[in-house]
Amino acid sequence: MLQIFTNKKNIALMAFALMCIMANAQQKSVTLTQAGTLSSQITAEEKFNITELSVAGPINGTDILFIRQMAGTDNEANTSTNGKLTHLNLQAANLVSGGDSYYFVKKGTAKKGYGVSENNLVDHYMFSGCEKLVEVKLPASTQKINNYAFFGCKSLTSCVIPASVDHIGDNAFAQCEALKNIQIPASVATMGNAAFNKCAALETITFDDGCAITIINANTFNGCTLLKGVKLPSTVEELGKLAFANCSSLTAFTLPASFADKESDTFQNTPIKNYDVEEGNEGFSAVDGVVYNEDTTELLLYPIAREENSFTVPTQVGGIGEQAFFGAKSLKQITLSNKLTNILSKAFAQSGLTEITFPAEVTSIGKEAFSGCKALTTATFKGGPSGISEKAFFGTGLTTVTFNQMNAVPELHQQAFLTARTTINFFVPADKVDAFKQGLTAANAVSPTRFEVKPLTTSSIYGLQQEGSAVEVSRFNAAGQRISAPVRGLNIVKMANGKVVKRIEK
């Protein structure tokens, strides 16, 4: 009997709670004939209880402030109300200039107010910080979405961007942490910096057919950690600084047909395993997932999340681009092309390389080219480069650096060889020992790391000539399938010197 009574009591409590929820979930539709009058159409009791609101007719800054308060946020950052509004439909509304300021930004001791400055403009900070908003449908007549319009709307999962919008401003949707999908209409011609920065839940971005955007600006999708794929319009020519950085779920990327330029750190810390280039691109090419210039004489982008621990640079390559191998942690060994002359800044920075041999034709090593390669212990130069730039080997594990030939001491720059090791041994031709010591000291290239400069012996040269002959290039299983690591049984291993070795792995 007691159990029955308890169950009935629980059911009654649940029913009461449900009634309360339903009572609080209020919907309202309002049609205005004059901007600034929304508050006259909604009672004080309704203001903080309405959860779904549809507005038609003209609205201005005064109405936007009222809507913000209904959505739990006042006219400054981190100021809240008791509002419960989660769903806002403005498709039949028209934004008109004028009315009160709906948002204030502190600048020193002063405050700057923001309101609706133009017709059909979702202006600066319009819904910024409205953390309770879940869905927003903008006026069908909207032409622009200005800077910070939805910044920090942490619960926003959906925003319908009208087909009339031609611009999305800086940080417009930045830190909308719940936004899962976004559709960019064909009308959008420009997007500002960091437009979708740190939208951590964003999985897909769809650009409508006909979208003619030409630039993906700096930080646009930086920190979109769930973004799995994106197909850019073929009109995109440029990718900005950190545009797709820290996108930890993005593993493949296709460069558009019009693509012509990118910043060196566009994909920083993004685990790309394969790059492709859209058909029709006349400036770039992709071979086995690696990006080169059109005639494959310069290697520009290596997919840093590849599991292979070795890579052979094609024989025709004469240059390695900025940050080409940046952060390639799995890469332990690399065989460079004998035609290679230039290695640009940060080309191999923070990679997993353990040793490196530079062909005789290499003339310059760029700034921070190998910085942060903590596993790198040995560097061998078959010739004498003309210059080694600032911090080229900064923070590596180098213990031995060998110069096989040296017509003149390279131009050494500050901290070029400053490492985590206590001592670095430099081997140089005997007639260059004193000059090389002076060069290291004058440029402050090593200090405070200790170093010794020793004459190169015949045995050192012989060892150098053998360098790389035993480097593994690729590996296959017994069925002829390429593998990234040893597997049990027969392994067929191709070496850098052209030899093929059969190994039995246990």
Feature names for model-found ranges:
Residues 1-27:
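Bacterial Sec-dependent N-terminal signal peptides
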Residues 53, 291, 436, 459-464, ...:
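Terminal processing/anchoring signals of secreted or surface-associated proteins
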Residues 123-126, 146-151, 169-174, 192-195, ...:
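Consensus positions within tandem repeat domains that build extended binding/scaffold surfaces
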Residues 27-33, 51-59, 77-102, 107-120, ...:
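Structural signature of tandem-repeat unit edges
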Residues 1, 7, 492-506:
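C-terminal tail/sorting-segment detector
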Residues 477-499:
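Short, surface-exposed loop/turn motifs with a glycine/proline- and acidic-biased composition
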Residues 455-482:
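Residue-level detector of functionally pivotal "anchor" positions at catalytic/ligand-binding pockets or at interdomain
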Residues 438-460:
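A recurrent domain-boundary module in secreted/ectodomain proteins
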